[in-house]
Every structure is written in structure tokens, then in C-alpha cells.
């Protein structure tokens, strides 16, 4: 599963990555099945690699976040503003919000489908099983979940978590942790 959330096999859940930079790959070509078969012939172990919470490539405006899953993308506190991660073009990876129950269920279904489809792989490598960084996720959903978990009301959102501005409202070069950051 690529950083775009597209997969290299025919899936009933995730979109198929049938082309990249002009190179087309037919839907009936199962790249992983080929690697498993040929790798086993050579006596190799074969692992599948899945980028779990990655949902798009910001340099190409491509991926599930750019298709029908825009609501699942992380909201970042970027340079003093709440910004959808797809709008931060200096960040190539468009991450989804790991705390969103819809995102979690979708990813679990992709992983279960993969495990059913390829039981003969020797293992799985999971990448991007995380938030994009300390500046993500600042969505209303994450705020609500944080308040419930911590048992607090965040009065000055986002500054009580993280601040880009000094006490005079001037933008800092780097963020500073707020009173609720842990």
C-alpha cells in the first residue's frame, strides 16, 4: 500500500495503483503474487509493505484523500493556522487522522483483506502508523477526544496544546508546547 493509499493488487476496498508517471500496470497483474512465487523459488522470504495512515502524495495531488476521503486527512497546526495537510505542499505525505474511527476501521479492513489475499507472505512491514508529527492532528474530532481522555476543557485551542505565536501574536520560527501538551 503506497503513501497514496492505493494498492498494487486488485482490492475491493482500496483503489488500485494502475499507473505511475506514465507507466501502466494492468489490473490483472498481481505484483505481490509474482514476488511471493518468484521469491520462494529463490529461497527468499517475502514481506508485504503497507503505509497504514498515509492517504495521499501532496506533490502530485494524488491519493485517497484527493479522491473521496478528504474528510479523513489530518488537520495540522501549521505556521499559526489550522490547515488541512493536503494544502501543505512542503510535506509530500498526506496523512490521515489516526484517531478517526472511520479511518481506523477502513485501515483494519484493508489489512484483513491483505492477510486473506496473501497468507503465504512471511511478514508485514507497517510504515506510517502514526500522526504526521507534533503539529497533527488538530481537528475538532481530535480536540474532543483529547478533552475526554485528559478530563480537561481546552479553553485556548490550539495554544493550550501548541503555539506558533509569542505573547504579542508574532509568528515564532518554531512551535512551543502549551500547558496541556504531554
Predicted features, each with a name:
Residues 25-27, 45, 62, 112, ...:
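Arginine residue identity/basic-tract feature
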Residues 6-20, 54-90, 129-173:
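Aromatic- and acidic-residue-enriched segments that line the glycan-binding/catalytic groove
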Residues 13-29, 89-108, 174-182:
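The substrate-binding groove and active-site-proximal loops of carbohydrate-active enzymes
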